[in-house]
Design a protein with these regions (language model features):
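Non-DNA-binding regulatory cores of transcription-related proteins
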Residues: 80-138
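Conserved hydrophobic positions within beta-strands
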Residues: 136, 146-150
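N-terminal intrinsically disordered, low-complexity, charge/repeat-rich segments that act as generic
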Residues: 1-77
Length: 150
């Protein structure tokens, strides 16, 4: 097993990535607004349909709300709290992957180790929730052995 990466380092990296995602969505919203207004059109004057700037802005706004809500989930995690079971804020090391319970993410690399963010809404989380070190969980024909939790 690899060495334990400090939970505070994992959380800090996740917060940074989430902020970058929020910044990206904010910039995209501004770009779409600027493009619509530069074409002398307000969003409601553009063509109807799924490609209209108004609908696109609405979709972007919903996605921005979602990533902001995820940021609040991350901010609610206290890295000083040790975890003995799979729960929000836990780092869960399995025989397949290492997960950080909070929000879903593609994965971050710290000190050569890849850590995947897992949402409490993820199907795998519902199978792992409450389990302890040494327990095993089967999900989607894959057996996960929990090697460490902290």
């Amino acid at each position: 097993m690899n060495h334990r990466i400090a939970k505070s380092t994992i959380l800090s990296t996740c917060l940074q990535k989430q902020q970058e995602l929020i910044d990206h969505f904010n910039q995209r919203v501004e770009d779409v607004k600027a493009e619509a207004y530069n074409n002398n059109e307000t969003p409601s004057q553009t063509d109807e349909g799924s490609n209209s700037p108004e609908e696109f802005l609405q979709t972007l706004g919903q996605e921005l709300d979602f990533v902001r809500a995820e940021m609040e989930v991350l901010r609610s995690i206290d890295p000083a709290n040790p975890a003995n079971v799979v729960e929000r804020g836990a780092v869960v090391v399995t025989n397949h992957r290492t997960f950080f319970i909070g929000v879903s993410s593609e994965g971050i690399e710290i000190d050569g180790q890849k850590i995947f963010g897992m949402s409490e809404h993820a199907p795998l989380y519902s199978h792992m929730k409450g389990h302890r070190k040494g327990d095993s969980v089967e999900y989607n024909k894959t057996r996960y052995v929990i090697e460490d939790i902290y």
